[in-house]
Swiss-Prot record:
Biological-process GO terms, alphabetical: adenylate cyclase-activating G protein-coupled receptor signaling pathway; cell adhesion; cell migration; cell surface receptor signaling pathway; granulocyte chemotaxis; inflammatory response
Superkingdom field: Eukaryota
Name the record gives this protein: Adhesion G protein-coupled receptor E2
Record remark on domains: The GPS region of the GAIN-B domain is necessary, but not sufficient for receptor cleavage, which require the entire extracellular stalk. Binding to chondroitin sulfate is mediated by the fourth EGF domain.
Job description of the protein: Cell surface receptor that binds to the chondroitin sulfate moiety of glycosaminoglycan chains and promotes cell attachment. Promotes granulocyte chemotaxis, degranulation and adhesion. In macrophages, promotes the release of inflammatory cytokines, including IL8 and TNF. Signals probably through G-proteins.
Localization per Swiss-Prot or TrEMBL: Cell membrane; Cell projection, Ruffle membrane
Stored Pfam families: 7tm_2, EGF_CA, GPS
Gene source species: Macaca mulatta
InterPro entries, A to Z: EGF-like_Ca-bd_dom, EGF-like_dom, EGF-type_Asp/Asn_hydroxyl_site, EGF_Ca-bd_CS, GAIN_B, GAIN_dom_sf, GPCR_2-like_7TM, GPCR_2_ADGRE2_ADGRE5
Mode of membrane association: Multi-pass membrane protein
Single GO term (MF): calcium ion binding
Post-translational modification summary for this protein: Autoproteolytically cleaved into 2 subunits, an extracellular alpha subunit and a seven-transmembrane beta subunit.
Amino acid sequence: MGGRVFLAFCVWLTLLGAETQDSRDCARWCPENSSCVNATACRCNPGFSSSSEIFTSPTEICDDINECVPPSKVSCGKSSDCRNTEGSYDCVCNPGYELVSGAKTFKNESENTCQDVDECQQNPRLCKSYGTCVNTLGSFTCQCLPGFKFKPEDPKLCTDVNECTSGQNPCHSSTHCLNNVGSYQCRCRPGWQPIPGSPNGPNNTICEDVDECSSGLHQCDNSTVCFNTVGSYTCRCRPGWEPKHGIPNNQKDTVCKDMNFPTWTLPPGVHSQTLSQFFNKVQDLDRDFKTSSAKVTIQSILKELDELLEAPGDLETLPRFQQHCVATHLLDGLEDVLRGLSKNPSIGLLNFSYPAGTEFSLEVQKQVDRNVTLRQNQATMQLHWNLAQKSGDPGPSVVGLVSVPGMGKLLAEAPLVSEPENQVVRNETHQGLLPILLSDVISAFLSNNDTQNLSSPVTFIFSHRSVIPRRKVLCVFWEHGQNGCGHWATTGCSTMDTRDTSTICRCTHLSSFAVLMAPYDVQEEDPVLTVITYMGLSLSLLCLLLAALTFLLCKAIQNISTSLHLQLSLCLLLAHLLFLVAIDRTEHEVLCAIIASALHYLYLAAFTWMLLEALYLFLTARNLMVVNYSSINRFTKKLMFPVAYGVPAVTVAISAASRPHLYGTPSRCWLQPEKGFIWGFLGPVCAIFSVNLALLLVTLWILKNRLSSLNNEVSTLQNTRMLAFKATAQLFILGCTWCLGILQVGPAARVMAYLFTIINSLQGVFIFLVYCLLSQQVREQYRKWSKGFRKLRTESEMHTLSSSAKRDTPKPSTPGLLGLQS
């Protein structure tokens, strides 16, 4: 026994010594999460790993082993997840789950007791207002109550849905939607009520209009009549009544007053017993006026006006301008009175006529979409009904037309102010001439007062007296002036068609209208004649320029005859040129007068040279019988320049000094025909071409005798025949064809106008043809000039070629120093 104890004690001491030796030999460099095996080796702790189980390298480290990923075979079970820890791992329940025991972790699937957590029960306020919490496996959701939706910025906050604006309501069209918090209602609109058996509010509500007028629910004033409308009502003035000042008609608060007779009194400053009696009768009608008797009052006023204009009495003794003022006052007042008294819808359609010719047509209708035509014996008016409707006034529309032929007595000699395209009368142009009134004076009015710029034109068809041929017809209206009087005007009115006894007018405003006739013949321009004039004069200018150059440069033909030709050509050249470029420059009166006087002088000078040409031709023919050239030459040279340029200058000076304002017309820079002023040109012209024609006839008679006395020598015969041909051509050159201008009357006027324009616009062509192209001496000179020109051109070309050849020829080389040495 004792030996065994001793043996055990010895073994224990041996082991204790070995352990002490090992402890002293443990390696001190082992890394974190490891332990030493001996003095030279280490081993990683459980849950960590290195490159080998036991390692001896001091640089080795121990890494944590992730037991939650392969190849580890850790399984935590359903609704849980493995969570790695330092050197170990845990199993935890998924969010929204918890262990039955309440513990937070477990180690393996056998310990898994994870179950769903009901968040809605744990926190009833988890979802905000108007939201409901719904538990789900491992989580929860918030759902909005009906009529609400989530706000985009906060998925837990619900906000109201406006079913009325979003269109998410089935309300009937007879209701209107009212949004509530989380809901809506379908309520009847104001002025509507639920149909029998229908609720008022739910989405199946159906409503019908309430007739406030028949049910007595309206609040219309006693001066108005209730008119039911869909969902409401309006209050309109009673027939013959009108809204009080500042209060619109057809409103719920409309208040009306009985219709007043429009104010119509004697115009100030006019002293006439006849007119005073008329307005006394008008005042009597005003005093006894009742709305119900509006039709009778209209008839009475028109009857009194008809009698006044049939026998104006002392009105005709008033000065013309006062008569025009009275007419303006009568037309204005008549229009206002008739418009005011015609608003009674019970009137309907009226047509009155009176002994002196006054006619009245009226139509009163509710709003219609059609044209209306009012016909009278002497006038017809056509327009669309929408022109008569006053903006914002649902009442009846009025269209009226009154024809007052007697008004023409007061409007006699009234002035006309027309637009430029219709300008036929100008005080400075046609003094004392006034347009003639052809038709009756008519006045048109509508219930709409704004008739100065109508949306569509009104058409008037006038019957009138026969129009004098070639007189212009104008559609005019009476325009009121600032002084209380007025004048005829054409602005806004156009003449669409005119015949002998009828005219169609179209106007964009309403007033008093009539048809006027110009007091003198108005000639319309023929575009064909204009083209012929400008083409003929342009060709004549070219020929006159060539002829003048020929007479100046051709020395062989220069004599008294060519001097006459040259002066005639220059005068016509300047006159035609001024005519082409300045005849229409009427915008400046002074400039136009200067142009007209210059044309007057140049054409008179040209005709004077034509007279001298005819005289010289006559003397030449006479001297074929008796030779006396020297005396002729001295006589011609001494007189021709003073006569040709002096006489026209005196004539123009006298005309300009006596009536300078008659130079220039509204359309042309020429002499005006008034007071015989145009005869300052026509008189000398007629005298000259008459003398020229007589001289030419005598010349031809002399030549005929000369031809009969000649022998048959060919050269003499040919020269004399050429002289005869030239003498005949002088009919065109010497202005004898200007008589065609005087013959422009009657049926042949158009033919004469064309002949006059063609022949006289080509006068320069005849001069160049007869005096240049048919002259043998001139033709010979043309040939010489042509040969000289060709020779000059050839020499120029040869000189050019010679200069070019010299430049192209190589120059001989000059020997240098090396050449000299050799």
